[in-house]
Each structure stands twice: as C-alpha cells, then as structure tokens.
Amino acid sequence: MKLPSDIELFELVDKLSLTYFNKHFIDKVYFNTRLRTTGGRYLPSKRVIELNPKYVLESNKEEFYGIIKHELCHYHLHIEGKGYKHGDRDFKELLKATGSPRHCSPLPSQQREYRYKYQCIQCGFVYKRVRKVNMRKYRCGKCRGSLKEI
C-alpha cells in the first residue's frame, strides 16, 4: 500500500468514521514520521490524530485501518465528553463494538534478530539472546538446569 496524500488520508478517516461510528470526522489527521513505537496517537488538546506512516508501508491494509479505528474511538469519546483513555470502560466497550484492536502488532522492521539461542537441558525452555552467554556461569531461571547452545 502506498502512502496516501493528506486529502486522501482525511477522506479515508472520514469514511471509516462514518462506517463504524455513524459520525463525520471534522478535525485534522496527518502522518507523523517521528512516531517510532506506536501506530498512532490522538492529541485531545489539539483534536488531532497523528498516524505512523511506517504502518502504511510495512503492514497490510487491515492493520492500518485498525489503527485508524482505534484512534477514532479516542476521538469520538473525547468529543462526547466520555472516558477516552485506555483504561476507561467506555473506551473498552467502543473498541469491542467497532472491532478495533487494543494494540497494534509490532513493525517487521522493529523486530529483533536474535543471534544466539540457548535451551535448558532439564526443562527444555528456549532463551533467545543478542549477546553470547557464559554457559558455565548462568543457568535456567525456571528450574536451575544447565544451558546448551542450539
């Protein structure tokens, strides 16, 4: 999926808002390239939705639409004066009613590559590590068994 323009993005958000919330989206939405660990955010003081452009480029359409629906839940509840934060009951109920995700999946480009894998000899638990582990010094945290490199 290619990155839509600001006008196309606004039209997409308004269309999803009408489809799932039966209300128009009348405020601003734009891409924020500085977002790194989140799919999007709603700024209540400015009534602005910011979206991470990496999710358009690296994930599928359903994942990106889910992020927009999640942020629209924050938006519409804030406009109505209801609880719009993650822990509020109104927010959780609206997420469930619209089929919006609670969290977005991690970006493929942000996932770690583990160079070393160790397995406990006794319980079989697998540890993934970026750095090498001294197997004589460290043991399994679950059963205290010794480790072997896979």
Swiss-Prot record:
Its main location: cytoplasm. Binds 1 zinc ion. One of its GO terms (molecular function) is zinc ion binding. GO terms for biological process: response to stress. The keyword Zinc applies. Zn(2+) binds at residues 70, 74. SMART domains: SprT. Keywords: Cytoplasm, Metal-binding, Zinc. It is found in: Cytoplasm. GO terms for cellular component: cytoplasm. Residues 11-149 form the SprT-like domain. The active site is at 71. Its cofactor is Zn(2+). Belongs to the SprT family. This is Protein SprT-like.
